[in-house]
């Protein structure tokens, strides 16, 4: 059975949730063993697929789950703002580690390897390709190249201030243009994830709201502090 068919069956059976297991770098949760535990728990809870960063994490997760895994490698480059799977060798390493789908930065920014070359390498290995995009133009370009999935992953992260809400409009526009859209980026509530489906998303990736304890704790702390200040001001 193909990876795409397997993923589609998981979506039909349990829903269209992809869980991104990426701890805050340097946090107490940032170890392959903990990432593997997160991924296993997400799989047991009904996730349709997983998104895993880094070869060590992917190698730790792969023996424990049969779900399709979207693999990425993040790098901080001096010569380019592109961070997600920027090199051909990253694709080779992710394939070797067990990724079924490989995601790469699909934006039109300066980069060490052309998008066409990255996609060709993914296809050479017989894997599915996901383009992490920031705009309609990015998504349509990568769709024309032949990417299997178009993610809204980088919307709001390439310039200016990052908004609080997900980019539902981009999901809708890409879906209307015929893209198989994976909504990603700031989907912090179940209601937002469901809204993405109503806008045409094929699946929804959720990360921080499920697997980043620090972020979730900060959300609660900020809300409680704001209410406490409001109550104090009222007196």
Swiss-Prot record:
It catalyses: an N-acyl-D-glucosamine 6-phosphate = an N-acyl-D-mannosamine 6-phosphate. Pfam families: NanE (PF04131). One of its GO terms (biological process) is N-acetylmannosamine catabolic process. It comes from the Bacteria. One of its GO terms (molecular function) is N-acylglucosamine-6-phosphate 2-epimerase activity. NCBIfam families: PRK01130.1. Belongs to the NanE family. This is Putative N-acetylmannosamine-6-phosphate 2-epimerase. It comes from Edwardsiella ictaluri (strain 93-146).
């Amino acid at each position: 059975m193909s990876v795409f068919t397997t993923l589609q069956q998981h979506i039909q059976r349990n829903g269209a949730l992809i869980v991104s297991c990426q701890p805050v770098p340097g946090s107490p949760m940032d170890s392959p063993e903990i990432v593997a535990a997160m991924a296993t728990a997400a799989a047991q809870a009904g996730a349709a697929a997983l998104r895993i960063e880094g070869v060590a994490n992917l190698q730790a997760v792969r023996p424990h789950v049969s779900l399709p895994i979207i693999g990425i490698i993040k790098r901080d480059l001096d010569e380019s703002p592109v961070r997600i799977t920027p090199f051909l060798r990253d694709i080779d390493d992710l394939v070797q580690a067990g990724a079924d789908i490989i995601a790469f930065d699909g934006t039109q920014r300066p980069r060490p390897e052309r998008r066409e070359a990255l996609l060709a390498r993914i296809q050479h290995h017989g894997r599915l390709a996901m383009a992490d995009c920031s705009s309609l133009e990015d998504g349509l370009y990568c769709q024309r190249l032949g990417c299997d999935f178009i993610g809204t992953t980088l919307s709001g992260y390439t310039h200016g201030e990052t908004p609080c809400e997900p980019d539902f409009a981009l999901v809708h526009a890409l879906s209307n243009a015929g893209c198989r859209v994976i909504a990603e980026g700031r989907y912090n509530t179940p209601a937002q994830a469901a809204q993405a489906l109503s806008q045409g998303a094929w699946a929804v990736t959720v990360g921080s709201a499920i697997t980043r304890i620090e972020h979730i704790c900060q959300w609660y702390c900020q809300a409680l502090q704001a209410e406490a200040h409001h109550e104090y001001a009222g007196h």
